[in-house]
Regions:
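N-terminal positively charged helical leader segments and presequences
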Residues: 1-68
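Short acidic/polar active-site loop segments enriched in Thr and Asp
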Residues: 102, 191, 217
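Short amphipathic alpha-helix with an adjacent loop that forms part of the alpha/beta core around
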Residues: 156-162, 179-188
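Mobile, glycine- and charge-enriched loop segments
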Residues: 37, 62, 68-80, 186-192
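Structured adenosyl-cofactor binding patch, chiefly the S-adenosyl-L-methionine
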Residues: 204-221
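RNA substrate-binding interface of SAM-dependent RNA methyltransferases
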Residues: 70-168
Length: 221
């Protein structure tokens, strides 16, 4: 069954008005009156709905029932991704959305060979957010991850304190691995996890040292 998001609470809206979604419903999926859809509202609650009218600019529905299924992870995972070359961030954003991350933040590390140019940032972020939106629908998410504006490494270090724990994957780490580290945690007390992933060229030893000195756990897969 196809899923759609609305920006209001379900009690305040009985319409899908996102024009891309309206076109997708009527022209691509060719849904009709009485067809069922899934609607997720601004509170990230999921509802089974029935289409009752389709016009050029909106789709009207009625709520059949709330769907009480836990779709999201019990912890917010924020991925700080080193800016990769080319269009790789498109695929990264799509796959991270599909596996349940909460938000994605591009980071400019020293060894990044690419960057998101300031004059193209808004357009790039908007395109990535559209990719995330479609991936959230396809993977039955109730939360649409947000792709944040790129940050510098210094900004990343300051950001670490906003998370319960932070981890970084480093190719030179040989002892501490992801599985054993998470086995040692009481995840019921963890609200958010910052996951730091470097660019193709890796993270410099100096960056790793600074991350570790600010409480980040250095791990190998």
């Amino acid at each position: 069954m196809d899923r759609f998001f609305i920006r209001q609470e379900i009690s305040q809206s009985t319409f899908i008005e996102n024009q891309e979604d309206v076109k997708h419903i009527s022209k691509v999926l060719r849904l009709r009156v009485n067809d069922k859809i899934e609607v997720v509202d601004s509170n990230e609650k999921e509802y089974l709905c029935e289409i009752i009218a389709i016009s050029k600019d909106r789709v009207e529905y009625k709520v059949i029932e709330e769907v009480a299924i836990k779709r999201e992870l019990g912890v917010q995972i924020k991925v700080y991704q080193g800016v990769p070359k080319g269009q790789k961030l498109d695929l990264i954003a799509q796959k991270l959305t599909e596996i349940g991350v909460y938000s994605i933040i591009p980071v400019e590390f020293k060894r990044c060979v690419s960057s998101i140019k300031e004059e193209k940032e808004d357009k790039k972020i908007a395109r990535l957010q559209r990719i995330i939106y479609e991936a959230a629908k396809q993977s039955k998410r109730n939360h649409i991850p947000k792709i944040e504006s790129p940050m510098t490494f210094k900004e990343l270090v300051k950001e670490l304190k906003s998370n319960t724990i932070n981890i970084v994957f480093y190719e030179c780490e040989e002892e501490n691995n992801l599985k054993s580290y998470f086995a040692s945690l009481d995840l019921s007390k963890v609200e958010s996890i910052g996951v730091i992933v470097g660019p193709e060229g890796g993270i410099t030893p100096e960056e790793i040292e600074l991350l570790e000195s600010n409480g980040c756990k250095v791990l190998t897969l």
